[in-house]
Amino acid sequence: MSVTVAVGMFDGLHRGHLALFERSLARAQSGRCVAISFDPHPDVVLAKEFRALAPLTPLPEKHAFLARRGIELHVVPFTRELAALTPEEFVEVHLRAPFAPDWLVVGEDFALGRGRSGNVERLRSIGQEAGFEVESVPLLSLHGSAVTSTRIREALSLGQVAQAAELLGRRYRLLGTVVHGDKIGRTLGYPTANLRLHDEKLVPAHGIYAVWSRLAGEARWRPAAMSVGVRPTFGGVVRTLEVHLLDWEGDLYGQDVEVAFVDHLRPELRFDSREALIEAMAQDIIHTRQRLTAAVPEPPGDA
């Protein structure tokens, strides 16, 4: 049985990554297709000073996403010792010994090993000795720039969730469990579900968003407005994720809820009165309905 291995961080599993996986599956044909990724992110390990970097795609999500496409995920712990390996050592320990691949598929700008010396040209040379061929997949460009995880991070950090969706090829999602909050939304006439995320994941910028929401075990997406922020009107300092499901009533405590970001409505604001906040929330609901009318929900398994 033939074996094809793709190597990369694959954070975000964006359109560029999907193009690479398409080539990997084509090379594998009916054989085994493996994706090697790393955890934690190399930028966290190699940074001179501590750097927090929440992933775009937590490992459980990455496993599920690839499994649905017939790809096995193999996670290599990223350490300074791993980064110090020569390309030949990396290939022997993490490619040839466990998988004996027939094909290695990487992006055209990919490099591994000490000092990132294992570029495509060197990997092809190593492959001739180790018995595998190398295919490099061109970077995918959109609006004049390469599709990268960095671009997606930048878009989300600015609240540009529609742009992030264009780069990803699907809407950015968060999954969490509904926990008890202080029920401020209920006193304002807009009860919200407070989400505690299952896994560490990058959260878009503070603000109000139009989202599709889905309850665990359901295929149906429900329209919702979401607040990401600290609730400055009430002197908050801790970030909360609050979802108001439109035209829905019920007890959500303890249930899992997934949200898919459609559009950014406005930044988080501090209001001078509860009345002003309530009026703004009413407008948020109107704008949410307008945005979602033109935004068809994606299939539940598309994440």
Regions found by a protein language model. Give the residues of each.
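Classical nucleotidyltransferase
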Residues: L82-P191, D272-A280, D302
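A short acidic, helix-capping loop that chelates divalent metal ions and anchors anionic groups
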Residues: P42-K48, D109, A146-V147, L269
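N-terminal catalytic cores of NTP/NDP-binding nucleotidyl/phosphoryl-transfer enzymes
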Residues: M1-P58
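Residues at the starts of beta-strands that form the adenosine-phosphate
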Residues: R32-V34, E72, D102, E133
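ATP-dependent adenylation/nucleotidyltransferase module used to activate substrates
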Residues: A64-A67
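Glycine-rich, highly charged phosphate/nucleotide-binding loops
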Residues: L53-K62, A83-V91
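A conserved beta-strand->alpha-helix junction
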Residues: I36-P40, L73-L82, P138
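Phosphate/ribose-recognition catalytic cores of enzymes acting on nucleotide-derived substrates
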Residues: G181-A303
